[in-house]
Amino acid sequence: MEPTPFPSWQDVASALVATAAGRAPADLVIRGAKVVLVQTREVMDGWDVAIKHGRFAYVGPDASHCIGEDTQVEELSGHYLIPGLCDGHMHIESGMLTPAEFTRAVIPHGTTSMFTDPHEIANVFGLRGVRLMHDEALLQPINVFTQMPSCAPSAPGLETTGFEIGPDDVSEAMAWPGIVGLGEMMNFPGVVNGSQQMLAEIAATQAAGKTVGGHYASPDLGPAFHAYAAGGPADDHEGTSETDAMARMRQGMRSMIRLGSAWYDIESQITAITERGLDPRNMIICTDDCFAKTLVEDGHMNRAVRHAIDCGCDPLIALQMATINTATHFGLEREIGQIAPGRRADMIVTRDLRTLPIEVVYARGQRVAQFGECLVECPHLDWPTDTRHSVNLGKSLTAADFEIRSDAAEVTANVIGVVENQAPTKALTQTLPVRHGVVEPDGIAQIALVERHRGTGGVTNAFVSGFGYGPGMAMASTVAHDSHHMIVVGTDRAMMAKAAMRLGEVGGGITLWQDGTERALVELPIAGLMSDRPATEVAAKVTQLVEAMEAAGCTLNNAYMQHSLLALVVIPELRISDLGLVDVRTFELTPVLP
């Protein structure tokens, strides 16, 4: 299926001018609304907007001269009209949905623009996978822009991916329609140390006049941070404190503050605006990672904006951070992010700016959602057969594959420590018993990274603490940021083998086993990352998974996200990869048993 290009301003400029002047009728006129102008931080009561060919032609006190015989007229007295919301940084794959189904889920929440970084699928299928995501994105009735992933692998030499991304791939992608920049530059040590590959990717992006996304996951705000800023990233979403936000803005970067399914970083950073008084133009609200369950039950960008307001932010400033600031950051302020002539007619009808109930959503001048229901088709790509067969284990796994052996009576082990509601882990040590030559978890859990891209049969084993799991369980997932092999966590090695083999059977997803039976299964057949079923169906299965995790003893908030991040070898302190245990503080492999 080929996308239908949305007309450019140049294509329709004459019609927009004629409509605004009253020489040609508008397609749609909305009258008497409280129009929110984020460009001036004003609310204009009783204003009208006139729309032609999906763009705003006239925005002002009286659009009666734009009304013709066939013009659709809607009265909105007493209601606010605000720009459609923009998510400045996010990964569609985190919703475990295809671009089409993710779009269908967020439209009723008022999201009309998304800036996506498909680096999850890049690790599985490389540039081809990115293009497939991008092609489906271009089919959607809202604006789904793509940032070309920068880091596959995220940490060269510390993990192996299905495919790698390099400067030539970045240069090629910069010529695709709808590409807005380079995705988050996670290899911050590479930038700081002058990696020629990383700098070449950044240079290719800047040469194309596009935006470089950042990712500085370190508390060090000394010379390393300044070197990273000098390397070209234009934004960063990894801050967790007011100090982090201020440091980024002072270095000319935009601070992206996030509220996702597992990230709660708005409250701790927005005080840089609300209390310290820094210029809010340099702060952007984003979600980063949102599960289908969150989208179905809680919302998307509307949830994040409401949270910012609840944290003391002026509603108009919060809206700026989710509209015009984002558009300006990506050089699209002439296209999206404000209700003004020439821009795409993306807008939301709401009766209250603080609680932000989303009543009606328009995208490109068309009503796309009303009272929580998506009214438009979100077309699917015909995904190639091989993308649905991406789990290649190479052999039948048994309990013996998950053994960590020692000749001692007890050992001191390096242990990954999970921290609730935070991406960073703690590097812990724990004394563990050895029985019959096998190290036993003894109150914690085992973790394994099972290679699934090349069918090597490789299994890397270690230990993890903090989930609270009881005996006889295992959970496996092919969503294993960022290399997306397979993470298996369990307290029973036989269950770990069963869980891993089950995902090989279904082509990927998440499964939880307890006492010999499967208690939950979320099938993710596309790249082992996504389902092309509706968000409501995926969310229902995720709910079953969460209930099964709780029954197995885990009560952490959003524990699944913590599970999926245990192989993300660019976020401190301790992670696992197919090459071994990784100390992210030093970016070196470290033994499980020192």
Curated annotation (Swiss-Prot):
Source taxon at top rank: Bacteria
Enzyme Commission number, as recorded: 3.5.4.2
Cofactor(s) required for function per UniProt: Mn(2+)
CDD domains reported in the protein's UniProt record: AdeC (cd01295)
Any single biological process term in GO: adenine catabolic process
HAMAP family according to UniProt: Adenine_deamin
Protein name stated in the entry: Adenine deaminase 1
